[in-house]
């Protein structure tokens, strides 16, 4: 409590110093300089307001985008903390890529509970303000009425995805496993009776060892 009180006092003191310096600066200006200063300040405020409105509109666009992509985070029990932190970094990359995309997708983070949920919220900067749909439920629970539209993207599928369909929702396995679990996401899709497919990356990208490098627009497609 004492530490917080001291921090509050120091913050108030810094605020007073800034206000005093600002007042002194204004008083030292000529009337013409003051008018120009106020004009520039208003322009900055207008620009920031416009940027905030554009960011809000883009956030809304991402939440209502027709194409849905689910990041399945139900694999926390199969990962160590360092792997979950690595997964959190990949989530940040995916989210950043989506916010910069000309046509964003509607992102779902499902199975976001337990240790995976804790690490994600700690490691992902500004997570509470992300324009995503988060749930501790599985994607089958969250999207129970859309099961027929769910397609699990897994590199082990024998089916190649020919095109993206607006009515379908694509699931990507959120796991960093260093190839410990063969066919993990494929087996999961088969057990749940949902469709699965692999991205046609062999036709467009080079392989580096067992790592599949993909462009941000395809988010993350990992061998499991």
Where are these regions (language model features)?
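Intrinsically disordered, low-complexity regulatory regions enriched in Ser/Pro/Gly/Thr
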Residues: 61-64, 99-101, 144-146, 162-165, ...
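Eukaryotic short linear interaction motifs
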Residues: 78-80, 115-118, 159-162, 178-181, ...
């Amino acid at each position: 409590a004492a530490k917080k009180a001291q921090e509050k006092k120091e913050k108030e003191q810094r605020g007073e110093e800034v206000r005093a310096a600002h007042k002194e600066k204004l008083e030292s200006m000529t009337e013409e300089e003051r008018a120009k200063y106020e004009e520039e300040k208003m322009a900055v405020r207008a620009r920031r307001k416009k940027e905030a409105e554009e960011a809000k509109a883009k956030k809304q666009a991402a939440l209502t985008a027709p194409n849905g992509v689910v990041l399945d985070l139900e694999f926390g029990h199969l990962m160590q903390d360092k792997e979950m932190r690595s997964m959190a970094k990949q989530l940040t990359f995916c989210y950043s890529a989506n916010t910069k995309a000309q046509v964003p997708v509607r992102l779902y983070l499902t199975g976001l509970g337990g240790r995976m949920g804790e690490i994600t919220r700690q490691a992902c900067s500004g997570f509470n303000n992300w324009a995503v749909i988060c749930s501790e439920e599985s994607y089958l629970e969250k999207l129970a009425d859309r099961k027929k539209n769910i397609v699990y993207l897994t590199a082990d599928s024998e089916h190649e995805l020919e095109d993206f369909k607006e009515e379908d929702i694509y699931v990507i396995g959120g796991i960093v496993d260093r190839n410990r679990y063969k066919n993990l996401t494929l087996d999961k899709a088969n057990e749940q009776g949902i469709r699965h497919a692999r991205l046609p990356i062999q036709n467009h990208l080079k392989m580096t060892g067992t790592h599949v490098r993909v462009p941000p627009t395809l988010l993350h497609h990992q061998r499991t």
